[in-house]
Amino acid sequence: MSRKAFVKGANPYMPLWEHVPDGEPRVFTYNGETRVYVYGSHDTERTEYCGKDYVAWSAPVTDLTDWHCHGICYQAADGSILYAPDVVQKGDTWYMYAADCKGSRIMVARSETPWGPFTDPVQTELGFDPGVLVDDDGRVYAYWGFCKSYCAELNEDMATIKAGTLRENPIPHCRAQWSPDDGCEGRECFFEASSPRKIFGKYVYIYSRRVNHHVPELGVYEDCNGFLSYMWSDRPLDGWQWGGDISFNGGEILTDAEGMGTMTFRWGNNHGSVTEVNGQWYVFYHRQTGRDEYSRQAMLEPIDAAQGKDGKVWLGRIVYRDGKPIASCPVEMTSQGPQVNGINAREWISAGYACHLHGGKETAWIEPVYEQRDDISAPVKNITDGTAVGFRYLQFGLQTPKTVTLMMKADGAGKVSVRLDTPGGKEIAKFDVKDGETTVPVQGGIIGKHAVYFVFGMKNGTAEMDRFTFDD
């Protein structure tokens, strides 16, 4: 194996061995250093959602590829499984809203540092998936709910609800077999994952919506809660107006001539939020790996943020006319994440960074890994005839590479076609399917930033893709 660096800080932005879904990004300054902190669940149980601890991760605002784990920051006193948390700062204290006992008991714990440990938990009056906003005037608002949403102002104790402020169902909830039977059929469709923010002086309620109708342009033809959506208001507890969708974890959307879309990555539940870092806004969300929803991973993408003349907050991929926002849609799901110029094509790139897994006679998946090594790779397994494994995007620089090296395992025979920009794009290399590390020449000039796809033509059997790299 060539001795070269392994890609890190792409998408997922944490190491491939880490599994932190439901990430709430927060920008905090401590001892003069400003960092982005992410607080989420921790998929360590492997056979069910989440785990029995929270870990805190952070990165300097100057480099969102350089993430550091501060270790365990909270565990429930009774050792119960913890669902999605949130953390806010008020004064010199950081407050963690911890979802003990699978989210049925919301505790607030305190710390004198943003990375914890968070201690002395007190039970609150909040419910499932709590999100908290400390307003500019110091007043504190909380948002929560599963299927049905709630919000309220909190008392000074940061735990109890201020009398007369509780709002029930501020956002119409989705229809589902486990939800109340008064669910809406409109676009709002609240599901879970409440996350409040203040943007451009407006209140923004970010949440996971469960779509109960077809969205053909995104390849949605069944009930689907892979969206992070938002509403906005002039007030913190009511008056919510539809904003749009920020993120969708169904991968690249392939669109046919009739405008009908096809997802290329297995969607699943979604949870996250947005934050501004050095003038650029980002959405933090999660993806699914493995064959279930118990090994989710933290993802991020840069997004547009703007305000219309009517005061509306626009988030996501925004369409402008004459310099004014007129429409928006979810940002694309990528392999590059914070590496906005593309992943270095000359480093080892794990197959686990794929954002496109589509086609094939059977379903391929990214195999979860847990060993804490810098050179760990998460392979794509169960590759069959027609499977395309795609990466958006790689950076080739100003010089065309001479070779591409692929590491894989196989129990069958076939060919691998390496294609540029689309799964059916220009072929730049071709491999025989076989065990081990194989190097072949690159055909044609390649410079700059491109999507790269490995399209498998299997005569028989299956293959497993581990990693690849380009060389001069």
What are these regions (language model features)?
Residues 1-472:
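Carbohydrate-active catalytic/glycan-binding domains of CAZyme proteins
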